[in-house]
Structure formats: structure tokens, C-alpha cells
């Protein structure tokens, strides 16, 4: 069994979070395309930028989770404010509640606060506040030696 077959089997038959990494040209995108075609799980593919989302045939993180472009403080008050201001349509909430597998491509570009916010949103909408990512399986893909998280001007001043 090849490494890709083993990873595919692991995604299909477990609910564990997985980090898939490799240098450019090692088959990460090919693996993702196969997974999208063959995996029966309810899946969403996201990426931190529009270009990365297009390449992964997904959407941006901010689009799926209806997040504003800002830094997110890991406090209870900040989360309460985020959920109070969040205007997520019922169909988008349904997508998050039915989600079994969340694929984050180009994870090296995702800031830690954004990953923490994804966790909080999934816990909130799945009504599973004590389970990481609301029980949704996470597959993060990327090369940590490539691109680092992008910061906007306001974030760099903090």
C-alpha cells in the first residue's frame, strides 16, 4: 500500500484529524482531487486565499465560515461578539452541521487565530462545545516550508 493509499484509507475509515504534507510535486493536489471524487463523506474544501481556493476547487475560509477579515482574539467575550455579529444564512448553517470532513489546503498560510476561530464556529453550530472542531474530521494539507500566514496591514500593527 502506497503512502497515498494509506492516507486515503485513513481519511475514509476514521474520524481522526490528519496533516498531509510534502514538497511541491509530491501529489498533494492529486490526492485531494481523488478524495473529492471518491470520498462519500460530506466534505468542504477551503483555503486561506482566493487563488489557493480556486486551485483546490474549493472556497475561501472566510467565505465558508462568514468571517470578517480581522484577527480573532481567543477570549470568550470575543467569541460571543463574533457569534452575535455573525449573520449566517440557514443553508450555510446546515452545511456546517452536516459537515463530516473539512479539508484546509495551503494550511501553512492559515494563522493560528483563524484556525482557533474555525474550531469555535464548528463547535458552536454543531452544538458540541467540548469536542474539537465540533466533531468534524479535519484534513489539513500543505508544506510548512512554503508560504507563511498572510497578515494585512492592521494586523501587523498589533
Predicted regions and their residues:
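Conserved ATP-binding/catalytic motifs of P-loop helicase motor domains
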Residues: 1-158
